[in-house]
């Protein structure tokens, strides 16, 4: 729901305004009702008593809005849904208006208005709650200074020009409000408008459209008219107004009756009747004020659009079950299904916009900039597009005081100067390549593009504020408008439609437009080359403008590109050209050179204009200089039958060298502000691109066409100048296509990765996005000749083809087939990044029943408001930020409260100079009400060779884990052995829950992390021995142990059943980072982890002591234990019965009476647990639920990846350069080199 409070000032008294308002409404109803699709019917207008506001006038109207709704959206709706009913209660100076449409149950508008004799200074007229006030946007409408739409301006309605002949008032100057406040009269209409449209993919866009076009635009014009028509109403009384209203009602009834009789027949009468049948439970959120939210075509379309659609749609139900299925009933069924989908799947899961945060205190930004969705009006006159880059849309991350007005567009850049800071606070710049939907027929409206970017910006802030607080204020968005290259193709294909000659609605309701052909035709045009050059120039302009702005001064962060369907194609080719145009291009390899000719038949084989002036291609023979320089960028995919050496510029960027895939950072002259006619020598991006996100782009089809017309072309050779490409799409999107099968054909058998739903997994579900992990999981597809010894399960992927010698003793598993191994290496080398490329987004199944021609608009709108998309992007960008630290730095993602200080001891700086931190803190479990004590040890070096003695350590606790805010609890000094004990003050004792703890060394900001778990008495727990119950291979030699099949599922079953998970291991605590990272790598559920205190000869004794302390001091009730035969005695000492002790592995005869051996493995055991799940429910006292999550969610760790094996063919030097991988995000970076008991090796 979008809530705005409008303040409308007028220089008149309240009594005058009452007459002016009612006169204006009835006059606009007369003038702007033209009949079917645009008009107003007044069904009732009578006084009431004891209603809203006391006694007043009740009005019931029907708005006809069909002609004011975009054609693609109109195709989704039956005619009955194009009528909106309005009920208003006017108890002046209080009014209330409600718009209803039973057909669209999850759409509602509600407006409350107070008319007060002041200047609009009252901050909370409507007594809103704190959450509502944070969500509310205050917008002051100035009838003089605010601009009206170009097609609506009339000189006689301009307050700057109007002077009343009867009252002598006017004209009004720009400072009229200040003058009226001093001299009077002055009044203010406070209008609280609530708009809700809870349908997937359209929520944010339509809610904002209703506010900006249906409410604000209508109210601005209506109040300008009310002022400028004062000579007509100044002498009227309320009795005269009522008489005019009755006359208007009769006139409108006659006009609509004629129209209905001539076109619709009796169906038009249904709306009026159905209004009395409207269900009282229909959602009625709000929008513009009833009386003013005018009746006319301007008002009604917008307001009407916001209003609701007549319940006469129910009449189609009978026709659906009567004789045949009509198009109207099909439309009803589609919308009902999309609404029903939302109900069945729970609204929190179904609606992808960030609406769900309305009740949170810290969710809503304090400032939300206004924007206009003018693209929803088909015939709206938009100003000519200005060459160059429009006013940038900046993410509203810097809050303002509550109630402050959102800045006007003209004030946006001026205000930016106030945001100057000493250092650039922006760490990631997003450049949005926005071209529009492939079905856009016009030149593209800049305001519409800015509206989409503002929607994305709002979604960014909402998600960032809740789950990525470290990124708040460090992200900026800029719009790069791209040419609508598909417009000409759409016009051409529309003319070829079998129904192009038919003007009725049949052609709109049928899917006769081949959507897949549009991008293919567009990229084959002779003008496509210029479009790519224009995109490069505008992108460079946007980047340069950002650097010149106060926000971008000193910017040195990463630049990310986001491209919509068409913008993604243009951006991809721009990146490919940038990769080949830069100095030292990889295109110098002969391998990348391809023969080609023009795709367009009218132009013969010519030189690629994008390659003009670029002499780094290393062709075998020079190209003739006499060849003309005109050629389309897309035509580079054609073979040259004459065998000429015309090289495919885009394809020529790929080589077999091991050079890193990154854009050249060499400087180049800035692009000109005007879009060039053709690419120049400097037609490349001026900056390095870290990631490129595609939103439903048909890029795969375009590349497939180039591959088809040029069989010798290898798509993988089109190396875009970015580090990673992410192809996001909905499975039902008819415009989207995959990319991975073009790079590796066998990926057609591998499903795209599913982007986790934000409502369930805001920080991700722990699934690995790495290409190497996918190749490992699906190794059977790529290593067919290799015998796999360990089955691949959802929780355990065999690493057979990475380390053939570790599978077993069989000779077949010693080495992999050379051909298949080289294929895997080839895929890794040719891939566009190190992660998967194709990602599938959630969409309702009901969308498959919608007309195909309506889906491109719907899906294009859905990306900008999708919290799933925003959270996914933030996870990738923030993850990208963390590995950029140097090896001696810590991956801290927050700013500690205290800056670095000098060491307390002078020797400390010398002792730790060449060693890496290996701090660790023990997970602590305490019973509620008992003292809470945290313990940590601060050491440096792989074997704890240096002890941090006598230094300050700050203790931070995340008291609200979802908030991401670290609270400083205190400071302690380490003792002579590097240990620290910190008792939590009693006044700050924490309640039941799991709390992350971070202990930060004041001197260098390295830190240790652990969890403080507070439980109630009698909490039931399950214990797992890591080495005894999880590992399927011995890890003494330093290899990464495999996970037993089904182990993760068993642990997750116990956690889902409500038990506390406890992990124990006999490994020394110096290996904590590696063990927890291993658990994270395999998605084990979060739990308490216990280690031995240093190296010990009796680890079982320490295990037993730890578990005994849990039972005696914490009062845990351990109900089951898993481990190896060595752990039987430990569990027996705890009092566990044989039926509660589960041992994995071969049965030992002497222990058969003391435990249960799981000889059939975890998979069979899990089936037994699930079959008797009712008997495993916790029987303890009721308690607050502890967090249920995976280690991989809290700490996406990938520094355990076996890069030494994955990259073996690339040579040891590159492995050394790239390092062992990425450190865990919530674990201190450790480079432990233990002599024994290692989980992984580091080269």
Curated annotation (Swiss-Prot):
Which cellular compartments is it found in? Cytoplasm; Golgi apparatus, Golgi stack membrane; Endoplasmic reticulum membrane; Lipid droplet
Q: Name one GO biological process term.
A: protein transport
Carrying Phosphoserine, the residues are: 300, 304, 319, 326, 329, 342, 345-346, 373, 382, 593, 600, 621, 895, 1236
Region Disordered: list its residue ranges: 259-330, 581-679, 1206-1243
In which tissues is this gene expressed?
A: Detected at high levels in brain, and at lower levels in lung, kidney, spleen and liver (at protein level). Ubiquitous. Highly expressed in embryonic retina and the central nervous system.
SMART domains (UniProt xref): DDHD, LNS2
What's the name of the protein? Membrane-associated phosphatidylinositol transfer protein 1
**Segments of skewed composition (Polar residues):** 271-283, 643-658
Q: Gene name on record?
A: Pitpnm1
Q: What is the lineage of its organism?
A: Eukaryota, Metazoa, Chordata, Craniata, Vertebrata
């Amino acid at each position: 729901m979008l809530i705005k409070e409008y303040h409308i000032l007028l220089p008149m008294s309240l009594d005058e305004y009452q007459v002016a308002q009612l006169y204006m409404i009835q006059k606009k109803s007369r003038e702007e009702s033209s009949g079917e699709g645009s008009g107003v019917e007044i069904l009732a207008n009578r006084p009431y008593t004891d209603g809203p506001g006391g006694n007043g006038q009740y009005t019931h109207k029907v708005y006809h809005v069909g002609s004011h709704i975009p054609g693609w959206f109109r195709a989704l709706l039956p005619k009955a849904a194009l009528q909106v009913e309005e009920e208003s209660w006017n108890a002046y100076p209080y009014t209330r208006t409600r718009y209803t449409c039973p057909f669209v149950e999850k759409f509602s508008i509600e407006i409350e208005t107070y008319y007060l004799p002041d200047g609009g200074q009252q901050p909370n007229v409507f007594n809103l709650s704190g959450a509502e006030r944070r969500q509310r946007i205050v917008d002051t409408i100035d009838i003089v200074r605010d601009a009206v739409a170009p097609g609506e301006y009339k000189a006689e309605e301009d307050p700057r020009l109007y002077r009343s002949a009867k009252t002598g008032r006017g004209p009004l100057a720009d400072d009229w409000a200040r003058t009226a406040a001093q001299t009077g009269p002055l009044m203010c209409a406070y209008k609280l408008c609530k708009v809700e449209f809870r349908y997937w993919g359209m929520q944010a866009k339509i809610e904002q459209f209703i506010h900006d076009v249906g409410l604000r635009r209508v109210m601005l014009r209506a109040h300008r008219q009310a002022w400028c028509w004062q000579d007509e109403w100044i002498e009227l009384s309320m009795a005269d107004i009522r008489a005019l209203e009755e006359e208007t009602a009769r006139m409108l009834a006659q006009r609509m009756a004629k129209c209905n009789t001539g076109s619709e027949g009796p169906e038009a009468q249904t709306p009026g009747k159905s209004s009395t049948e409207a269900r009282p439970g229909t959602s009625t959120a709000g929008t513009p004020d009833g009386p003013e939210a005018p009746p006319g075509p301007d008002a009604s379309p917008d307001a009407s659009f916001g209003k609701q659609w007549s319940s006469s749609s129910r009449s189609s139900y009978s026709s659906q079950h009567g004789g045949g299925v009509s198009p109207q009933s099909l439309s009803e069924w589609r919308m009902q299904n999309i609404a029903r989908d939302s109900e069945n799947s729970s609204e929190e899961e179904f609606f992808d916009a960030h609406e769900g945060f309305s009740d949170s205190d810290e969710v809503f930004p304090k400032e939300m900039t206004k924007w206009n969705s003018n693209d929803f009006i088909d015939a709206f006159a938009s100003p000519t597009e200005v060459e160059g880059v429009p006013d940038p849309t900046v993410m509203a991350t810097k809050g303002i005081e509550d109630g402050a007005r959102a800045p006007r567009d003209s004030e946006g850049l001026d205000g930016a100067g106030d945001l100057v800071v000493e250092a650039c606070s922006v760490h990631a710049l997003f450049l949005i390549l926005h071209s529009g939907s492939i079905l856009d027929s016009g030149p593209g409206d800049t305001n519409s593009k800015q509206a989409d970017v503002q929607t994305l910006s709002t979604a960014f802030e909402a998600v960032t504020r809740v789950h990525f607080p470290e990124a708040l204020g460090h992200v900026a968005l800029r719009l790069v408008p791209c040419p609508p290259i598909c417009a000409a193709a759409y016009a051409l294909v529309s003319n070829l439609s079998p129904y192009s000659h038919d003007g009725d609605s049949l052609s709109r309701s049928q899917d006769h437009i081949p959507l897949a052909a549009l991008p293919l035709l567009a990229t084959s045009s002779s003008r496509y080359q210029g479009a790519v050059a224009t995109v490069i120039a505008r992108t460079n302009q946007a980047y340069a403008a950002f650097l010149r702005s106060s926000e971008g001064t000193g910017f040195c962060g990463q630049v990310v590109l986001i491209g919509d369907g068409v913008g993604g194609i243009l951006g991809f080719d721009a990146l490919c050209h940038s990769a080949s145009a830069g100095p030292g291009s990889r295109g110098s390899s002969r391998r990348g050179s391809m023969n080609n000719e023009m795709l367009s038949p009218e132009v013969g084989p010519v030189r690629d204009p994008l390659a003009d002036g670029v002499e780094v291609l290393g062709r075998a023979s020079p190209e003739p200089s006499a060849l003309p320089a005109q050629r389309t960028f897309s035509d580079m995919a054609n073979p040259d039958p004459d065998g000429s050496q015309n090289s495919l510029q885009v394809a020529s960027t790929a080589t077999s060298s091991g050079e890193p895939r990154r854009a050249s950072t060499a400087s180049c002259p800035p692009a000109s502000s005007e879009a060039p006619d053709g690419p120049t020598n400097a037609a490349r991006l001026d900056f390095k691109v870290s990631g490129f996100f595609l939103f439903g782009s048909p890029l795969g089809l375009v590349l497939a066409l180039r591959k088809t017309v040029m069989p010798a072309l290898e798509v993988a050779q089109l190396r875009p100048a970015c580090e990673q490409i992410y192809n996001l799409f909905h499975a039902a999107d008819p415009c989207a296509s995959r990319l991975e099968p073009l790079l590796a054909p066998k990926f057609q058998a591998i499903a795209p990765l599913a982007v986790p739903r934000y409502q369930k997994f805001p920080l991700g579900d722990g699934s690995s996005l790495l290409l190497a992990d996918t190749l490992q999981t699906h190794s059977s597809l790529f290593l067919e000749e290799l015998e796999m010894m360990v089955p691949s399960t959802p929780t355990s992927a065999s690493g057979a083809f990475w380390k053939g010698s570790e599978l077993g003793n069989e000779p077949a598993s010693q080495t992999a087939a050379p051909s298949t191994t080289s294929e895997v290496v080839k895929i890794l080398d040719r891939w566009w990044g190190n992660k998967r490329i194709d990602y599938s987004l959630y969409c309702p199944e009901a969308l498959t029943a919608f007309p195909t021609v309506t889906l491109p608009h719907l899906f294009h709108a859905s990306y900008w408001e999708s919290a799933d998309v925003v959270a996914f992007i933030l996870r990738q960008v923030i993850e990208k930020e963390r590995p950029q630290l140097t090896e001696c730095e810590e991956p801290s993602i927050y700013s500690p409260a205290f800056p670095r200080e000098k060491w307390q001891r002078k020797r400390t700086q010398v002792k730790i100079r060449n060693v890496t931190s290996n701090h660790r803190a023990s997970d602590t479990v305490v019973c509620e009400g008992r003292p809470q004590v945290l313990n940590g040890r601060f050491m440096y070096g792989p074997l704890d060779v240096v002890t941090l003695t006598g230094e300050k350590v700050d203790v931070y606790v995340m008291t609200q884990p979802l908030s991401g805010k670290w609270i400083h609890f205190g400071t302690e000094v380490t003792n002579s052995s590097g240990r620290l004990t910190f008792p939590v003050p009693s006044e700050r004792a924490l309640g039941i829950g799991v709390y992350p703890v971070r202990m930060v060394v004041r001197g260098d900001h390295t830190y240790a992390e652990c969890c403080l778990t507070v439980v109630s008495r009698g909490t039931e727990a399950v214990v797992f021995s890591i080495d005894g119950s999880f590992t399927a291979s011995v890890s003494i030699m330093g290899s990464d142990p495999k996970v037993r099949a089904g182990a993760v599922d068993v642990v997750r079953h116990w956690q889902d059943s409500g038990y506390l998970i406890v992990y124990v291991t006999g490994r020394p605590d110096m290996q904590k980072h590696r063990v927890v990272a291993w658990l994270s790598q395999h998605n084990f559920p979060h739990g308490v982890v216990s280690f031995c205190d240093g190296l010990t000869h009796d680890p079982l004794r320490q295990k037993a002591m730890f578990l005994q302390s849990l039972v005696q001091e914490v009062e845990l009730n351990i109900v089951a234990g898993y481990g190896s035969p060595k752990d039987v005695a430990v569990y027996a000492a705890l009092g566990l019965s044989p039926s509660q002790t589960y041992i994995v592995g071969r049965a030992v005869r002497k222990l058969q009476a003391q435990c249960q051996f799981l000889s059939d493995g975890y998979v069979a055991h899990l089936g037994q647990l699930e079959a008797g799940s009712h008997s495993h429910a916790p029987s303890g006292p009721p308690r607050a639920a502890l967090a249920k999550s995976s280690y991989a969610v809290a700490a996406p760790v990938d520094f355990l990846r076996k890069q030494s094996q994955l990259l073996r063919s690339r040579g040891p030097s590159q492995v050394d350069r790239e390092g062992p991988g990425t450190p865990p995000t919530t674990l201190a970076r450790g480079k432990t080199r233990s002599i024994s008991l290692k989980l992984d090796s580091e080269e």
